[in-house]
Amino acid sequence: MSAACISYFGGKKLKLTHSYAGKELKHWNQAAFISGIERLLGLYKPETTLKQMNMMTSHDTDRMLDTYGGDEKRLKLSVIFSFLFPGAINIYYGEELGLPGAFNAGTRQGMPWKNEKIWDKDLLGLYKRLAALRKGDEAIKHGKFEFLKEYCDGRALAFRRSSGGEALLCLMNNSSSEVNLALKQGALGNKPGAVLNSGVKLKPAGPKKLTAVLAPWAYAVYRL
């Protein structure tokens, strides 16, 4: 999962040598990303996938900030996807603070507990909100994962987690241009309300229809 996220969300500044994977990563377009994730989900039974440890980085890799070439917009999309993906999220210490570090050149330094000036408080806040969302949501902890391909247009990415009567839908824009998505009636439930939103606006588009306007690198998570 980590290699797929880096290949898709990484962009032009992606560092192609990912030490933990032990191989060179190539850029993926959206079709390749969706295909790769679906193949990954098909390798094991759903109950096994839900117990897998999802680790984006470790002491044997570059830190995420270095992996994404310092591009925090892309980094955030990758973090959100990893938190909402089936399995147990594993966070290497300091990633939530936006610490830099290349493999064997800063990735194993001590945690800067007493130096809050270098903490990325905005990124830390995102990690906290995602952790709280995971903790209290059955759809994320136990639910099915599926891409909503009618809304995946090469720039916008849409996917859903669902379990019983609970569901979450995530929209994100992995591009530098605004995206307008015409949503089907009821796609976001009867009373759309985002539990996480950065740059997504909903506009009426006729009787009981909505258009989701996604700013560049925007994301939103809706509880259905």
Language model features with spans:
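Active-site-proximal helices and loops of the catalytic beta/alpha 8
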Residues: 1-44, 81, 100-129, 133, ...
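Aromatic/acidic polysaccharide-binding cleft in carbohydrate-active enzymes
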Residues: 4, 9-11, 50, 54-72, ...
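Short, solvent-exposed loop/turn segments at secondary-structure junctions
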Residues: 58-62, 97-99, 164-166, 174-177, ...
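Hydrophobic, well-ordered secondary-structure elements that form the walls
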Residues: 59, 82, 94, 130, ...
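Acidic/polar loop patches that form or flank catalytic/metal-binding clefts of enzymes
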Residues: 89-93, 138-146
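Carbohydrate-binding surface patches
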Residues: 148-187
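Solvent-exposed beta-hairpin/edge-strand motifs
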Residues: 185-200
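C-terminal beta-strand-rich structural cap/linker in extracellular carbohydrate-active enzymes
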Residues: 205-224
